[in-house]
Amino acid sequence: MSARTVVLDDLQQEAAKDLQLLTNKPVLYVCNVDEASVVKGNKYVDAVREAVKNEKAEVLIIGAGIEADIAELETYEEKQLFLEDLGLKEAGVNKLIRTAYHLLNLQTYFTAGPKEVRAWTFRKGMKAPQTAGIIHTD
């Protein structure tokens, strides 16, 4: 039995955090499918979804072959046209990153200066002073 499937009240959740149970960690299941199944999935994706439906886990569908083809394209426009032709809104790698950030309760803050643009990762719900502590480490 996975700790993700157990319903706990707030006090119990706090106590469980101290145990650092591996089965309480967020899980992302990535299903690599063929091109025909990349939009809606297939019976195997459905089986994974059914198996983990009570786990508070995410199931993501990606076509590794499609991702390889996208990586070979030169321009953003070419990549967008390729994705549109397949009925996709974004590349699988982008979905993977976005889903992982969501699952881990993370957000990104961007800073821009004359020499560089940086992305800073912080936990959702952090206050501005805490986030500033990540950005301004000097």
Where are these regions (language model features)?
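C-terminal-of-GTPase-core extension/linker across diverse P-loop GTPases
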Residues: M1-D138
